[in-house]
Regions:
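A short, conserved structural fragment
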Residues: 44-54
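Short amphipathic alpha-helical interaction segments
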Residues: 31-42
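Long, charge-dense, low-complexity tracts
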Residues: 7, 20, 45, 70-71
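Short amphipathic alpha-helical interface segments
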Residues: 1-28
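Short, cationic-aromatic polyanion-contact patches
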Residues: 1-6, 54-71
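Short loop/turn and capping residues at structural boundaries
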Residues: 24, 37, 54-55
Length: 71
């Protein structure tokens, strides 16, 4: 289910406080594109992750990381 896929991504990101590329998440979770995209969408709607699009040469890289709120 989408919830289970989102949970798998959440635990992966929560355990390793760094930015992840899409392909890294796909490989680490074993999810298909459709499952991974749905789970990322779920987490984004919940405000659990943020996206950082940075230029590297002529390619735009997509990173996913946890959002931490202190206060």
């Amino acid at each position: 289910s989408i919830g289970e896929s989102a949970k798998a991504i959440w635990h992966l990101l929560h355990g390793d406080n760094r930015k992840w590329e899409y392909q890294e998440l796909k490989k680490a979770t074993g999810l298909r594109d459709r499952e991974l995209n749905a789970a990322i969408g779920w987490l984004a709607c919940e405000g659990k992750i943020q996206f950082d699009e940075s230029m590297q040469g002529q390619n735009t890289a997509l990173y996913i990381e946890l959002s931490y709120y202190i206060g």
